[in-house]
């Protein structure tokens, strides 16, 4: 059956009538010619977590072909601090499947994400994007299956408080206007992200909602659909860029920071995963969680301490990961349980046709709901290195298939109660805890680095660089030192307010 792309949000997909994964150079050239595109942007993440941009004016057809084919040189030492200036040249080559129209450019502009290559024309081994590609390849080689992921992107919008229709403090979940003030901003972000190729599930206001010093702080979330893991990281990267740019146009401030004030909800970056084979979701069997899913979970239980090195990368991360909040602190998993590290959310496994019940005029749908089941890692936050985090999760899930006692570990770490309630103290004492600082996270990565370096997924130099950066924070006792000092906490929040993907490492 021929696929209909006419309603696709990405105008390139709608025009070319093919999925972005099938875009060729000829497609890009054709679209540029037929749609009056005058500029091309190459974009790529650097060490500070922000997308960098290289602008090209389309001089003529020959020049367009040259830049699409050959890419361009960039100074790697200015992008990644651990590349030596004496041998710093890198190539950036556009990936056609990431092409989108820049919604903020005054000139008609087509943008693409790029891959880094070294002087020998080989993929840069320690580039975040290539590391994720290697992690996914190793997962498939070991399991014969495909690793997919998607993110829940939480952020705060900050603006002047009008005082009208005040929302209830810390009760902003799924709130509507006029109590939620930034619904229109969020939906405009969603439209731009979708036009740039992001596969969005939905958006909504989140729990966090408060006023401070005449400003309103409103937490929002945009959640994506599961896609290939490489695409999942790309769309999160572009989404953060779009949200920040649109906020700038509106005069708002935006933060993805894990914690912005004591006693208020912090922002996480929960990552959902599913495992596919021949286009079918392998997370369920006969309506219950499959052995495949439980092995993947066991791998995450095993490597959870070191995954924080990729997903919780600055000191304020560990002010979010505290007991008795929705953010996890213990290494365990469970069904529909928000006190656990890995949660198995509702997966439409009930044997009823809810659509027909709600809409009696509808015929039975026979919709395959098994495709919807995921598992969710709840520890990461907005400081995460997006590519390294998802690569680390792919490694952890792969390890679950290599561990002979994986199913035993899954059984041992399963909980079906709120572990923070007093009556469950004994169960809580049996569970290992996540690191409580960047330094502790670095120690865990040092101990478990072999799993990440296996199959040459993470290079030893990359792991060394991550460990060095985390230890440089010297925050082993910071949480206890500042917990009773609002002034010191505020200084930390301000320092890491614009945190993002961190890729500072030895390359």
What are these regions (language model features)?
Residues 2-507:
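Glycine-rich, acidic/polar active-site loops that bind/position phosphate-bearing ligands
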């Amino acid at each position: 059956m021929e696929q209909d792309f006419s309603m696709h949000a990405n105008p390139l997909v709608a025009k070319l009538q093919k999925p972005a994964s099938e875009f060729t150079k000829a497609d890009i050239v054709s679209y540029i010619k037929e749609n009056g595109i005058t500029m091309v942007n190459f974009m790529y993440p650097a060490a500070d977590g922000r997308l960098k941009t290289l602008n090209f004016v389309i001089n003529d057809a020959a020049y367009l072909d040259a830049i699409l084919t050959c890419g361009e040189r960039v100074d790697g030492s200015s992008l990644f601090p651990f590349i030596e200036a004496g041998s710093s040249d890198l190539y950036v080559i556009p990936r056609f499947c990431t092409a989108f129209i820049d919604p903020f450019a005054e000139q008609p502009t087509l943008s693409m994400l790029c891959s880094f290559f070294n002087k020998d024309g080989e993929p840069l081994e320690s580039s975040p994007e290539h590391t994720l590609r290697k992690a996914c390849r190793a997962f498939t080689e070991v399991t014969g299956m495909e690793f997919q992921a998607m993110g829940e992107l939480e952020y705060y919008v900050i603006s002047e408080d009008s005082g009208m229709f005040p929302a209830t403090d810390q009760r902003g979940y799924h709130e509507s206007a006029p109590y939620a003030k930034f619904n229109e901003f969020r939906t405009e972000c969603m439209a731009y992200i979708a036009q740039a190729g992001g596969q969005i599930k939905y958006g909504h206001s989140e729990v966090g909602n408060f006023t401070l010093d005449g400003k309103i702080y409103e937490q929002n979330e945009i959640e994506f659909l599961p896609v290939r893991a490489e695409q999942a990281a790309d769309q999160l990267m572009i989404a953060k860029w779009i949200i920040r740019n649109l906020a700038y146009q509106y005069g708002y401030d935006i933060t993805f920071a894990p914690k912005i004030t004591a006693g208020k909800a912090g922002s996480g970056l929960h990552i959902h995963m599913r495992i596919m084979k021949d286009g079918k979701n392998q997370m369920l069997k006969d309506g219950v969680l499959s052995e495949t899913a439980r092995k993947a979970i066991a791998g995450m239980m095993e490597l959870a301490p070191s995954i924080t090195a990729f997903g919780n990368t600055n000191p304020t991360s560990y002010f979010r990961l505290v007991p008795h909040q929705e953010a996890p602190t213990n290494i365990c998993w469970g069904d529909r349980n928000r006190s656990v590290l890995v949660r198995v959310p509702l997966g439409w496994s009930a044997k009823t046709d809810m659509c027909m019940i709600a809409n009696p005029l509808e015929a039975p749908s026979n919709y395959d709901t098994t495709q919807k089941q995921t598992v969710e890692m709840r520890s990461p936050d907005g400081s995460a290195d997006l590519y390294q985090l998802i690569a680390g999760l792919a490694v952890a899930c792969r390890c679950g298939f290599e561990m002979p006692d994986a199913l035993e570990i899954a059984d041992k770490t399963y909980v079906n109660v709120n572990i923070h309630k007093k009556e469950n103290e004994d169960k809580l004492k049996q569970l290992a805890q996540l690191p409580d600082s960047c330094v502790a996270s670095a120690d865990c990565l040092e101990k478990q680095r072999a799993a990440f370096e296996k199959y040459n997924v993470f290079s030893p130099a990359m792991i060394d660089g991550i460990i060095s950066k985390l230890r440089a924070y010297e925050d082993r006792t910071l949480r206890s030192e500042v917990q009773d000092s609002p002034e010191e906490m505020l200084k930390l929040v301000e320092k890491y307010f614009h945190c993002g993907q961190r890729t500072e490492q030895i390359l």
